[in-house]
């Protein structure tokens, strides 16, 4: 049957229609709307709400899962019920088995991409005959390589499965990271930076995709906040480790920063090898020859799978070894309703990036020793963890993304103003340290935006690509940030800080415009939807071929 005519101004042109999965897709569970003052108690509860209660809808999705060869299709059960206590127990098990190891793998990423900051505190630049601009170029080469590897890595991960590709990535980049022990000048420095970028690119969206197999859309932001909390924990641990490793300067005639690269690279290699054994492909594939009992009982497996499907039925419209077609890729690229989130990713992290990368150089320029410099980076990392977890919890509690995420830009604005116009900058040793520490303690909203992008994608194929596109926009912003602090502008970086101030103001404006856009789009959809009769709405739900955010019965989160 065809979709009945929609007499409205709704922009049908450019909508996404997918003919690859057979029958038209029915309505998804995100239809339920939450008010502005919704709390956690209003969140989706798999033991209570069931979008498959309609037998026709359940049968349709059963056919979709069968046609896509979805790996969990044999445990799909529209009639399954479970208690709140059972679900909480399973979430705890998922946090211990899935989320914790995701954090360990992210630790491996951050160790090898972040230890350059500690290395330069040990006179690495002087040892190699490099200056500030060379350091910037190295960071830029890394980010450009990282940027261009994002989408190919995501496509490869979707083809062979993140459980295979992610451990391979970790092992490969750890070998390159260790090889930095042997760099001898600008050429080898840039080469290793490029290789690290190529091999690490796509890791984050790959891991987010894997996490989405186990968690619902309301649970994912908090797990991602744990994920990015690891970034700060890693900074603390590597600062302490650097304190020890940099004392190895002179051992066998080598500089301490060389030992830092070698030893931390080998640590990451161990994480990569372990990941081959600790990353199951899905909830139904935890039993292996080395883990014969698996992670879950048969009932727990059924609950894990069905709670995720009831939150988002489209999570089963592709299997976990299925490549994205060029058609699906193009559909995601032209989904203009996700562009506001990509623009936010491009801009909002720039004001924090230069101070973060230059933290050890700034602190050391204040007269602190190499070892005290690394220890003094710890306070901002500790506070960063607290504010990150707080802002993500706040977003979940109020079911508010835009205004809560905007707290990051509001936090950094007065700090950036002080960087530019405070007369005691650099000259006041402890005042400068306190200012930079407060700035870098900002509430990181990245977890909110990643989960926000995932939710507004509203489709597995779109979600896997949009995660990469969002992360690419963030990396592009980091590339821009690398050219804000320049060698001819130090030590006060007045020109650079003035640019950070302007960008910080722009970030606040973009947050407000993004919220206004999604409110407008939801009202537009609501107007068209309400113009349909009940029969037309039912017909649309069961027969439309529109997918993802293009559906009239989908509402954007904001």
Model-derived regions: residue spans:
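Cytosolic juxtamembrane N-terminal segment immediately preceding the first transmembrane helix
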Residues: 2-115, 126, 552
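Extracytoplasmic gate region of multi-pass secondary transporters
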Residues: 117-118, 324-392, 446, 450, ...
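Central mid-sequence intracellular linker of multi-pass
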Residues: 218-231, 250-329, 495, 500-538
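Central cavity-lining transmembrane alpha-helices of secondary-active solute carriers
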Residues: 140-155, 378-390
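Conserved MFS/SLC helix-loop-helix module at the cytosolic interface between two early adjacent transmembrane helices
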Residues: 148-187
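Structural signature of the two symmetry-related core transmembrane helices
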Residues: 164-178, 403-418
């Amino acid at each position: 049957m065809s979709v009945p005519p929609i007499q409205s101004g709704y922009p049908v042109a450019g909508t996404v229609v997918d003919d690859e999965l057979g029958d038209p897709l029915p309505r998804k569970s995100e239809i339920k709307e939450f008010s502005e003052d919704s709390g956690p108690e209003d969140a989706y509860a798999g033991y209570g709400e069931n979008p498959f209660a309609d037998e026709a809808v359940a049968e349709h999705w059963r056919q979709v899962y069968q046609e896509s060869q979805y790996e969990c299709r044999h445990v799909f059960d529209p009639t399954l019920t479970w208690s709140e206590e059972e679900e909480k127990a399973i979430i705890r098990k998922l946090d211990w088995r899935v989320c914790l190891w995701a954090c360990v793998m992210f630790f491996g990423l951050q160790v090898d991409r972040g230890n350059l900051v500690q290395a330069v505190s040990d006179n690495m630049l002087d040892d190699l005959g490099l200056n500030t601009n060379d350091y910037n170029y190295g960071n830029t080469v890394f980010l450009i390589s990282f940027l261009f590897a994002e989408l190919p890595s995501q496509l490869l991960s979707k083809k062979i499965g993140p459980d295979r590709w992610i451990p391979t990535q970790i092992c490969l980049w750890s070998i390159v990271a260790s090889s930095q022990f042997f760099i001898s000048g600008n050429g080898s420095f840039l080469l290793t930076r490029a290789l690290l970028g190529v091999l690490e690119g796509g890791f984050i969206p790959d891991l987010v995709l894997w996490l989405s197999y186990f968690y619902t859309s309301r649970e994912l932001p908090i797990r991602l906040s744990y994920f990015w909390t690891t970034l700060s924990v890693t900074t603390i641990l590597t600062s302490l480790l650097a304190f020890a490793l940099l004392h190895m300067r002179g051992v066998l005639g080598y500089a301490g920063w060389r030992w830092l690269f070698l030893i931390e690279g080998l640590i990451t290699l161990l994480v990569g090898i372990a990941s081959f054994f600790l990353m199951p492909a899905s909830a139904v594939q935890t039993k292996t020859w080395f883990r014969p009992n698996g992670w879950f009982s048969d009932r727990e497996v059924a609950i894990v799978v069905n709670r995720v499907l009831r939150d988002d039925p489209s999570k089963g419209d592709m299997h976990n070894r299925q490549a994205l077609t060029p058609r699906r890729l193009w559909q995601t690229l032209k989904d203009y309703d996700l562009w506001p989130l990509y623009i936010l990713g491009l801009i909002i992290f720039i004001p924090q990036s230069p101070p973060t990368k230059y933290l050890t150089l700034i602190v050391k320029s204040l007269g602190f020793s190499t070892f005290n410099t690394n220890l003094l980076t710890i306070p901002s990392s500790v506070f960063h963890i607290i504010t990150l977890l707080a802002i993500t919890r706040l977003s979940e509690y109020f079911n508010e993304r835009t205004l809560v995420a905007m707290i990051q830009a509001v936090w950094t604005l007065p700090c950036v103003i002080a960087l530019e116009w405070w007369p005691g900058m650099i000259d006041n040793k402890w005042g400068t340290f306190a200012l930079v520490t407060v700035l870098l303690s900002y509430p990181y909203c990245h977890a909110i935006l990643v989960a926000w992008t995932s939710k507004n994608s509203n489709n597995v194929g779109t979600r896997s690509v949009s995660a990469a596109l969002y992360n690419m926009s963030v990396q592009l912003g980091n590339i821009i940030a690398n050219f804000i602090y320049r060698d001819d502008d130090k030590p006060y970086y007045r020109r650079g800080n003035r640019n950070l101030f302007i960008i910080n103001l722009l970030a606040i404006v973009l947050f407000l415009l993004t919220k206004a856009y999604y409110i407008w789009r939801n009202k537009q959809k609501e107007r068209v939807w309400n113009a349909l009769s009940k029969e037309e709405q039912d017909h649309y739900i069961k027969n439309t071929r529109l997918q993802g955010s293009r559906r009239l019965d989908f509402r954007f989160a904001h």
